[in-house]
């Protein structure tokens, strides 16, 4: 049986394996995974599934970590920046920037006055009315919005021919791609702006220095991680002392006694104390049939690279490179142990180690190739007690003892039912382990477990180990650049202490007024959507009432949790963690214990809807139907997507359009599978379901006529274009068009309640036009042809196709820009929307 390949990233190295994607927004896998070995294209993720891949590469410079050895014994309070032979103080640079901004503002105003004086006769009646009753907005926020909008536009394009090009035509020029960057989008830029802010926060001296301060613990952990000098002094000694020795030694180091080896003990220590998945993995997740409860899932694991690489005829060189990597790590550990052993004997032991570990992974790959995931694994009839699982697999692993070691005997017993995500795989794996000849079993399993741990922790050791990992990636994937110490350590801080980091970000970079105005916008949009349900043409009365009930009951999480403003609350979260600035490896093990305690709490307390699924600095947004919540982290509530000082037509067009899109997902065919309490179950009537299908078909036809490309493709003489599969995108197309229409209606209601605002000093544009420009400019992008072609092949539509198609179906847009019937931006056939 053939399986697709997918990636799961271990703490220190990317490990490719097959896995079922968990779309329920749950906790994830059993090990705290790290993308440190993910090579050049890994970048860094702020949980950004909706707004594109980061695609950014940062090559680490070791020198940055040795700045403490700067020979200067003094430094000015206001530092200098040198550019070739000139030097400038930061104050001088700031003054220069302010002067330039002021000059630009003056020039914009002069241009507006000059332009308006020449074109009164061409200005629309709406603009004339606005000019007659008020002046232009010349506040700093309006100048900022006007400057940003005009700079990204290509005004030579007719907006009724290609509105995205009109709104974003100059964006690629202003945002050129570096050689190691495959794309830049609005959200990509926000993401890296946030990263820069977080870097500054992490590297700053802690303002609260008490032993219980979460800020101090976070920064001490981060500084211990970037201490390359300390890691070079320690080498692999920490791994040998704190992992190999507690497991009973290692055959390569000549201190292993097969008679004392206990698989049960080794698996428990590996999976729980060292938080590394070996023969299998597990996770605490939400029960799909009762979302108030948490359950334990048991899943496949145990391979250091894609299962396909182990067995395909075309991947022999990859297998050779992998074995070379294993051998190198073993040699480094042997050298750091101070072992005094005959070199021939040592070489034989290392070869045995490589053969043992590789053979078990090879057998796991064969099992993977010949099994399939369990269908509907959460079905109550497919769940199994821990006692039955142990007995039915010949007691190879005592699962009762294993999970009691993890969660405690008071929380788990033999009658605890677990979910096998890969039932056939788990049983075959345990049968394989049980069939290993007794003469070799202890040594072979020990060698395998030591390799799994070494592979996981190699990125946490000195540069010699990291370089071995890097060589493997260069051999296999031709990526010589590595993301370096800073990104690796940031990843750890982000995943290990996200609330401490999120609190610092929210307090430093987010104002309460930002949150208040965003909540005002979402209230207007939600009400506009509720009002629109009444006039909906494809829902019957029963479905309309259910839709309105769900929207009324829905809540939102905007910006950040309230506890982020209370230091004591954040300190309390991390009170059990001990962090030593000079002992990075022990810090990792202490964080493993913290994760163990956190998972136990989650299993025993069940669902907690007060939790935030995103960090405050994430750049994403979604409607989480299982909790009936709109999630908008503070990382999204920033310019150019949103800023509280901007006019409402700007914020409603940009942020409001996104909010409208995701609120529609609360009541479309997808949201129609979850009721107002988040319980799974269809609430659309049969008649409404059939009518909804007709609406989707209209959007399918609208997108079927679109083309992605053309793109220059390596190996192809002519540029390649890809047709849009409208059927696959129809439900998103409906949300896209409905979202911007709902945002527009909400904006009009806000005007009715609060009055018109002054327009920005942008020539010729009414507030309505600025609204649609703001929407379009959240979708500006530039991307390599290679990545664009890949996206096109998997039917990930580019922003220009999405934007133009969505707006062409809106009468409100075509009226705002007076697009004639039959023009590209005025679709002849309009579709029903929410």
Residues covered by each model-derived region:
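Intrinsically disordered, low-complexity cytosolic terminal tails
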Residues: 1-74
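Helix-loop boundary elements of multi-pass alpha-helical membrane proteins
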Residues: 64-104, 321
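Alpha-helical transmembrane segments in eukaryotic/viral proteins
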Residues: 93-134
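Intrinsically disordered, low-complexity linker/terminal regions across diverse proteins
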Residues: 116, 347, 357, 363, ...
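Short, Gly/Pro- and small/polar-rich lid/capping loops
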Residues: 128-151
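Active-site-surrounding "flap" and adjacent substrate/cofactor-binding loops of secreted or lumenal enzymes
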Residues: 137, 141-142, 158-161, 166-237
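Hydrophobic/aromatic-rich, well-ordered segments within soluble, folded domains that form packed cores
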Residues: 152-174, 309-332, 730, 740-742
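Noncatalytic, helix-rich "gating/capping" subdomain that lines the substrate-entry/channel surface
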Residues: 197-524, 561-564, 578-584, 588-594
